[in-house]
Amino acid sequence: MMKVIPLGERLLIKPIKEEKKTEGGIVLPDSAKEKPMKAEVVAVGKIDDDEKFDIKVGDKVIYSKYAGTEIKIDDEDYIIIDVNDILAKIEE
């Protein structure tokens, strides 16, 4: 895999795709689904205030719906996103 390192206060995230079904059990195609807003952090750029920023590689996050720049790496979808567009960290 090509290594992508985000510059500045940005993250490289991989959207978590969830299979969507209707109540009747019909699987919806990607074009009919709402854009996912959950992702896994793949890489972290240089964060100025590391002590207040508690997100690291492997964490799952919720991000703003239309934020970031979508890119493809080895036929996989990723997003480069500003840290301010991360809304929450998911703890399981």
Swiss-Prot record:
SMART domains: Cpn10. It is found in: Cytoplasm. Its main location: cytoplasm. Disulfide bonds: none annotated. CDD domains: cpn10 (cd00320). GO terms for biological process: chaperone cofactor-dependent protein refolding. One of its GO terms (cellular component) is cytoplasm. Transmembrane segments: none annotated. One of its GO terms (molecular function) is protein-folding chaperone binding. It comes from the Bacteria. Gene3D superfamilies: GroES chaperonin. Keywords: Chaperone, Cytoplasm. InterPro entries: Chaperonin_GroES, Chaperonin_GroES_sf, Chaprnonin_Cpn10_CS, GroES-like_sf. HAMAP family: CH10 (MF_00580). Heptamer of 7 subunits arranged in a ring. Interacts with the chaperonin GroEL. Together with the chaperonin GroEL, plays an essential role in assisting protein folding. The GroEL-GroES system forms a nano-cage that allows encapsulation of the non-native substrate proteins and provides a physical environment optimized to promote and accelerate protein folding. GroES binds to the apical surface of the GroEL ring, thereby capping the opening of the GroEL channel. Belongs to the GroES chaperonin family. This is Co-chaperonin GroES. The gene is groES.
